[in-house]
Amino acid sequence: MPKIAFVNGSYQTINKPSIKIEDRGFQFADGVYEVIALTNGVLIDLNFHLDRLNRSLREINIEWPTAKEAFNAICAEVIRRNRLVHGSLYIQITRGVSARDFSYPKGLKPSLIIYGRQSQKNQNLTKIEGVKVISTQD
């Protein structure tokens, strides 16, 4: 099954994304990203990650590319289309497309990319649940 990503309004196979060459994220790393763990089909600490993403966007003056309800629906659809159970969701939001220059015009439309990665169950659970240890004297 091909991996599917959400790229600027459409779902595409991950090996054929359409990112504009003059996207400021590509040219200047002008954007933010967030990675959210997925366990048993559930995004872990989703509100924490969305708050941090919101704060990061606000700090560099990038508008949210979509409404929160639509954003959550896109995340759920990427998980569904990729049949993800355990893994992570990668979210990248850039300032958008503009002619290559250090300054940028106001009102750019932000770019949004979301894709998921499958991983083994215990990789995420170890990070989330921790591991049990017993300490002994040397």
Please describe what each predicted stretch is.
Residues M1-D138:
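Conserved alpha/beta cores of soluble small-molecule-handling proteins
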